[in-house]
Amino acid sequence: MSEAPPIEVAGSAKLPLGMTPERFLRSYWQKHPLLVRQAFAGFSGPLAPDDLAGLACEPMAFSRLVVFERAGDAWDVRNGPFEETDFASLPERDWTLLVQDCDKLIGEVEELLAPFRFVPEWRIDDVMVSYAVPGGSVGAHVDQYDVFLLQGVGTRRWQISTDPDASLDFRADAALKILASFAPTHDWVLEPGDMLYLPPRVPHHGVAQQACMTWSIGMRAPAVGELLVDFAEQTAERIGEDLRYTDPDLLVPADSAEIDAQAIARVRALLRHAQDLDDATLQAQFARFITRYRSAQQTAPPLVRIDAAQLQAALARGAVLYRSPWSRYAWQREGRAARTWFAGDSWPATQHIARILQDHRQLDAAVLGKLAASELALLTELHNAGHLVIDDA
């Protein structure tokens, strides 16, 4: 077995991971934890604690308060949206406020994802931001996905375990999935700008040493069961009701209520036939699944639809198209062309416009350049479906 690479490195402005993305993916991604000191030197983040509390009061934000009651070794989990008075009654220590999808709610937070786009965009889930007072924590736990934990203001103590035999059993008496036992192998205090990368299923425990904010860039890792359920639903829609169980070779059974081996063989053959997906169908089903997976909100079409000429005129006078933050985007090659996917829906496209949509969250005349008629038509359809929002101010 090869020796694990260094677990702690120093970052820089040019190499926030302390190495090239290629080396990180080769040596650490889904393999080993990594602490990067000063990955983003002087980082504080675009949100202050009061801003985060304000978001937690919004109905469209998924927020939680986690309060640890030391006397009874108990955890109290409260779900938002909250009222301002909820925060006024909190104790001086041992609580944490967490808000998911902050990148969808605040444009400046979405910009923090840029250094992480060496990972496919459809693998990036969200930026969760937490604020914790001294002692604030969510307990020792494991995540089922890769996560980058970027320290903002304040300091947090992180303990992790790299023991391959560490128990992953949960406490039965807690409102959170907290590990029943946790024996750390590494112990650090993270300062603002430090970042800890953890692959899936690495036990870890973070505790605020002083009032602090942590920015969690989480990846998307659908479970096989989720894929199977979604693919089964898509397959059922695709094949309709004409493909059915048949038994033209049926013989008089010895036992009339028995499900015999011949029946199971027919079912197996039927399911194999239904699940026999060619590459194009598999690509389409996965793209539909992954671009709508774990989406907390749906896009809404605009009140007023426009045509291609109106869009072209708007761009000519300086309008900007923004991708809706809730519209997850991906694209696939189809020969020399492409197919674009937004939140589970697809449109044919040129590879040229597919890459522009990939590389730019804001589209103006300078970015778009000279568009083919089909490309302008695509942008118009995406606007009318709510995936692109026009700012004509």
Which sequence ranges carry the predicted segments?
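Active-site region of the double-stranded beta-helix
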Residues: 2-27, 41-194, 202, 207-244, ...
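Long, charge-rich, low-complexity alpha-helical segments
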Residues: 2-9, 31, 344-393
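Short, solvent-exposed secondary-structure boundary motifs
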Residues: 14-18, 77-80, 194-196, 310-326
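Sequence-level motif detector for i,i+2 pairs with an aromatic at +2
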Residues: 30-31, 94, 124-126, 335-337, ...
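C-terminal amphipathic alpha-helical segment
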Residues: 232-311
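Acidic, low-complexity/disordered tracts enriched in E/D and polar residues
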Residues: 275-359, 380, 391-393
